[in-house]
Amino acid sequence: MSRRKPYTLYAMLVLSALWIVFFLCAPYIAPFDPETTSVADRLQDISSTHLLGTDQLGRDVWSRILYGGKASLGIAFTIIGISGAIGIVIGGLAGFSTPRVDRWLSRLIDLVLGFPNMVIAIAFVGIMGPSITNVIISLCITKWAEYARITRGLVQIERHAEYITFARMSGASNLRILWRYILPNVLPPLVIVIIQHLGDAIILVASFSLIGIGVQPPDPEWGAILLSSRDFLQTAPWLLIYPGLA
C-alpha cells in the first residue's frame, strides 16, 4: 500500500530551514558588532547607517536582533533536542511495551502534563537561580511529556499494522521492529510537531529573559533585549517594537 508523500512536511522543513539559516548567518549579515557601544550614537532613529536605529548604549538594533535570533535558536534547539529525545524514547517504550509498562509510563506522562509548564519551570529556576542553563533544564523537565504522549499514540497505531505482523512472522525482534519499521513511520509527524514547538520554545525562553530569570543583559537575546529596553517605551519605542516583532 503506497503512502502519500508528506508535502506539508517538506514545505515546513524548507521554510523553517531558510528561517534558521538566516539567523545562523548573523555574523555575516549583521552590519555591526552587537556589543559595540557608542555613546555619541545612542537612541538614534532609523537611518541608512542603522536600519532599525540604536539603543541606549549606541548599539545597532538590527545587529542585536540578528544575533539575538541566533542565540534564541541555539537555546530552543537544545531544549527541543533534549526533551524530544527523552519523550520519543519513553513514548516509544510505552506504546510498544507490555500493558503494565505502558500503564506506569502513561501515569508518569499524565502526572507531568498535569502541572502547568511555566509554573514548574519558574519554580525550578527560582530555586536553582536565574541562568540560561537552569531555564533549559526546567523546560526539558516539563516538555518531554508532550512528545512522549504523541509518540505513544503514533506507535500504538503502527504496532497493529499488517506490515508489523509480517515482520513478527519473519522473526524480527521487538527492538528491530521498533527501530527499523515503526520509528521511520512515526518520525515525519513528530518532526512537524517539533518544528511547531520550536517557535514555542523561543517564546518561552524570551519570556524567561523578559522577567529577568533567563539570558541576562547585555547578551543579545530577544527577551533580554526587551528587558534592557523596557524603560524607553515612550522615548525610543523602536527598541521594543522591532525585537518584539522578531
Mark where each language-model region is.
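Short membrane-interfacial helix/loop motifs at transmembrane-helix boundaries
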Residues: 27-63, 212-213
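Transmembrane alpha-helix signature in integral membrane proteins
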Residues: 61-96, 245
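Membrane-cytosol interface at the C-terminal ends of specific transmembrane alpha-helices
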Residues: 80-81, 88, 92, 130-180, ...
